[in-house]
Regions:
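Long, charged, helix-prone linker segments
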Residues: 102-108, 653-661
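Short beta-strand elements
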Residues: 440-441, 597-607, 648-656
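Terminal, basic amphipathic appendages of nucleotide-handling enzymes
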Residues: 1-152, 322
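Short, intrinsically disordered low-complexity segments
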Residues: 40, 50, 603-628
């Protein structure tokens, strides 16, 4: 009897595969059940290997218990994408595989991979065939539809220019060629809107894939995609390696959005992984945005990406006018100046809608004692508690712990307790008391928790005449609110004073995106930006509305300072119950990095949120002139850490190309 040996990846936090044997040949990418200690785990065949040199009759190499499926989980391009991701992000390969396997297929049971038996036919619906394109849209479609192999394209389109229609036409062309399409969106709340547009355009089943669906529903979509029963899938970052049969096009909507970055567990960028996948599949990929990331614009400069522009709004509508409002000497009510409230009132009287943006949920972000200065903070995290009126609790936005509101200061027993600042709930309350007959619609993480909540809110917005929308970034992303003629931004200054390297990039994207919600059906729209820094050079440059000009200047500055995207960075993150353990581990790391050419390191530094869930958090900032240098150093560190007793006392991880230092 022949015995074959395999390296198998299992989902554990170790950067290695494990060798098992079996009496038959098994394809790479196949799911198998294997004994692991006292457990039985699902593993993925990574490679077939020769008989291990040290093998003897007393060998402890265990046997594979069972082949779970007759089909592989991942075909070669997706399999190779996972190998690349594990290598690039320096993350345990078993956990990377596990990230992209549906939950139901991670279980040891009788579920196997096979077709559902429900094929869809795709045609353009008659009602949608007469849609008239703008000349900009026609030009973009003509250029993009010519691309048939790997060649990343940036579709730059100002807000309201009709990028979604371009996506639809490109998808139609792809379907006519007998191929399938994957569309990635940054957030779950954007999937219903885009899903509706595709459903209105095409007959046939449109696949939807995101984390709020049941695991069974996600598995069904995954299987239908794998066996060619659906040819269009719209999903969030978890769908980036959706195994669509004969995929011919990947579209990334709002490519700049940081929600494409997973910040917990396996830290990866779905945008960058999608680009790698399209390279391995040798298919075109389109990245759409009104505010492209500096990383993407750098690649355009270097001729690695092609830029296609849509410079005018649909129907020739003018972009809204951005106005800064100096609030240094203005009393604020719920975070709003009197001039802001007057502008809201004038807009409502005309029968139009207003969008009020404040990137902070809850009622008040600070609960303070007037007697001794005590501030309510989380016992497990280094963060202030936020009062949520809807729950009558003080909430930690880091670990979501809830605390009762005390009537006496726990430090000095004073009853002189006050709430300061404003969140979405407080703004909502002030507006409800000011505009009694006007619907106030709050859109934040708390108001959209229930399944279908966002769809109901969007429906209410579209069915209302005069209304005031109050919300966080959820409102700023990709939504079409044609009745909004005034947008108000309450806390833009946070981006001007942030220590983050990419703070101004984030701020410019946010301001342009929020302003883009206004004036989609009206030439007289405006945006009010409340600020204590009305003369700030960067703010006034952003206010001009010329994002590409601002981004180009930012790239020039970053190039001179050797900041990303002109250098490669990694945060070595570290957490433990004691600051001393972090310090010993990271200082030892700094010492060995000091001898590495092409790499510099700063630290150890406390994270901006220095304590979370009972653990102290620190990091080392590692910067390299080239990605190859960085990758080489990180591989070296992994080997070293495995030898160190200090690494066993902390939880460490690499965050490559990080989007923040929180």
């Amino acid at each position: 009897m022949n015995i074959f040996y395999y390296d198998i990846a299992v989902s554990i936090p170790l950067r290695q595969c494990f060798t098992y044997k079996f009496d038959a040949k098994i394809k790479k990418g196949t799911r198998v059940a294997v004994p692991f200690g006292k457990r039985v785990l699902i593993g993925i065949i990574v490679r077939n290997i020769q008989k291990p040199n040290a093998l003897d009759s007393k060998s402890t190499i265990k046997s594979i218990l069972n082949i779970q499926d007759s089909e592989t989980v991942f075909e070669k391009p997706l399999f190779d994408s996972i190998l690349w991701a594990s290598e690039y992000y320096q993350h345990p390969i078993g956990e990377v595989f596990n990230t992209f396997i549906p939950t139901e297929l991670r279980k040891i049971d009788k579920k196997t991979i096979g077709p559902i038996g429900d094929h869809s036919e795709y045609k353009v619906k008659e009602s949608d065939k007469k849609f008239k394109l703008t000349s900009d849209q026609e030009g973009a479609i003509k250029k993009l539809s010519k691309v048939k192999t790997f060649s990343p394209s940036l579709l730059y389109g100002v807000t309201g220019s009709g990028k979604t229609e371009v996506y639809l036409r490109l998808a139609e062309q792809c379907l006519k060629e007998g191929r399938s399409v994957l569309i990635l969106v940054p957030e779950i709340n954007l999937t219903p809107q885009l899903f509706s547009r595709f459903e209105d355009r095409f007959t046939g089943d449109i696949g939807l894939y995101h984390s709020r669906q049941t695991s069974v529903k996600r598995l069904k979509t995954w299987l239908k995609a794998k066996f060619g029963e659906i040819k269009i899938v719209i999903g969030t970052r978890s769908s980036v390696l959706m195994p669509l049969k004969n995929v011919g096009l990947i579209i990334i909507d709002e490519e700049h959005d940081q929600s494409f970055r997973q910040s917990e567990g396996f830290k990866f960028s779905a945008r960058d992984l999608a680009i790698k996948r399209s390279q391995l599949e040798n298919i075109p990929i389109v990245l759409g945005s009104a505010t492209p990331s500096l990383q993407t614009l750098k690649l355009v400069r270097e001729k690695k990406f092609t830029q296609v522009n849509i410079l005018n709004r649909v129907d020739g509508r003018k972009p809204p006018k951005l106005i800064t409002l100096d609030i240094n000497n203005s009393p604020l009510t719920g975070g709003m100046a009197l001039e802001t409230i007057d502008a809201i009132e004038a807009t409502i009287k005309k029968g139009n809608q207003v969008l009020v943006f404040i990137n902070r949920r809850g009622f008040a972000p600070l609960f303070e004692c007037g007697g001794c200065g005590w501030i309510a903070d989380c016992h497990a995290c280094d963060t202030n508690l936020v009062f949520h009126q809807s729950r009558d609790r003080l909430i930690c936005h880091r670990c979501e712990s809830a605390y009762k509101v005390t009537s006496n200061c726990p430090k000095c027993s004073s009853r002189d307790l006050h709430m300061h600042g404003a969140g979405t709930e407080r703004v909502e309350e002030v507006l409800e008391n000011t505009f009694i007959d006007t619907p106030i619609i709050r859109v934040d993480q708390d108001s959209t928790k229930k399944v279908g909540a966002m769809e109901a809110i969007v429906k209410k917005i579209h069915s209302s005449n005069s209304a005031i929308l109050v919300g966080t970034q959820m409102l700023a992303k990709g939504h079409d609110f044609p009745k909004v003629t005034l947008s108000v931004i309450l806390n833009a200054d946070n981006g001007l004073v942030s220590p983050e390297i990419n703070a101004l990039e984030k701020l410019s994207q946010l301001l342009i995106q929020v302003s883009g919600r206004a004036g989609r059906n009206n030439n007289l729209a405006k945006v009010i930006i409340q600020t204590r820094y009305p003369d700030d050079i960067n703010l006034n440059e952003i206010k001009s509305g010329d994002y590409l000009s601002f981004a180009s200047q930012s790239l020039d500055k970053n190039f001179k300072m050797n900041h990303p995207p002109f250098s490669s960075i990694c945060l070595l993150r570290c957490s433990s119950p004691t600051q001393k353990s972090n310090s010993i581990f990271l200082e030892k790391t700094i010492k060995i990095l000091s001898n590495k050419a092409g790499v510099s390191a700063i630290g150890p530094l406390p994270s901006l949120i220095s304590k979370s869930k009972g653990n102290y958090r620190h990091h080392v900032y590692i910067q390299a002139t080239k990605k190859t240098f960085l990758n080489k150093v990180l591989k070296f560190l992994v080997i070293e850490f495995d030898k160190w007793p200090e690494s066993k006392k902390v939880k460490w991880s690499f965050d490559i190309d990080p989007v923040d230092i929180n």
